[in-house]
A protein has these predicted regions:
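Long, structured protein-protein interaction/assembly regions in large complexes
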Residues: 176-178
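Glycine-rich, mobile lid/loop segments that gate access to catalytic sites or pores
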Residues: 110-118, 127, 169
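A cross-family phosphate/adenosyl-ligand binding-site feature
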Residues: 1-8, 18-107, 114, 118
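Short, acidic/small-residue loops that bind anionic groups at enzyme active sites
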Residues: 37, 127-150, 157-159
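Conserved small/polar residues in nucleotide/adenosyl-binding loops
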Residues: 182-188
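Active-site glycine-rich loop that binds ribose-phosphate moieties when present
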Residues: 95-96, 155-170
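Alpha-helix capping and helix-loop boundary segments enriched in small/acidic/polar residues
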Residues: 10-13, 90, 117, 147-155
Length: 188
């Protein structure tokens, strides 16, 4: 069996851990895993312009301890759809056809999509054209309706809390100081 994995949307802690876990579990079952670079955009690979890599347990060992994602991630491009609750986005038919061609060329039996609300909406559209898809919810915003908490959120909260604690110590050491901590704007 051949399965694909991609990260889509914004970066968050835990993406590499998912990749390592997928590759390890697949390997124990005798399956092959292809990782797509730059989210869904990697699905638009053409012969000679491969935007993917066949992943091995040896090549992924230790990833869970590293931030970011070895595959890269994109929240714009050919697959970017913004939808509200209960609304459905669309992807250009030519993009879907190129996606089907890549899936067929690689002999993929399924695709694992690690992403937030927009990414999971795109995954649904791919499932509707016949590609078996497994969605792994992730978001630092914790705004996915079907989950209580997603990975990425707890890590983001912990890092912001620790940063605030450190800033408080610095601010208390000086009589006239204003400290600002900038974080992601979930509205973007």
């Amino acid at each position: 069996m051949n399965i694909g994995v991609l990260n889509s949307g914004g970066d968050c802690p835990g993406l590499n851990a998912v990749i390592e876990g997928v590759v390890g579990a697949a390997s124990r079952r005798g399956w092959n895993v292809v990782g797509f670079y730059d989210g869904f955009e990697g699905l638009l690979s053409e012969e000679g312009d491969d935007r993917f890599e066949w992943l091995t347990p040896a090549g992924c060992r230790g990833l869970r301890a590293k931030g970011g994602t070895i595959l890269g991630t994109v929240n714009k491009g050919n697959f970017a759809i913004k939808v509200g609750v209960g609304q459905k986005g669309e992807i250009e038919p030519a993009v879907l056809e190129k996606t089907k061609a890549t899936v067929k060329r690689l002999g993929l039996d399924a695709l694992i999509v690690v992403g937030g609300d927009g990414s999971q909406s795109t995954a649904l559209l791919l499932a509707e054209i016949g590609l078996p898809v497994v969605g792994v919810p992730k978001t630092i915003d914790n705004d996915l309706g079907a989950t209580d908490v997603t990975f990425g959120f707890n890590s983001a909260v912990a890092i912001v809390s620790e940063s605030l604690d450190r800033l408080e110590t610095t601010a208390n050491a000086h009589q006239r100081m204003i400290c600002l901590l900038y974080t992601s704007d979930a509205a973007d």
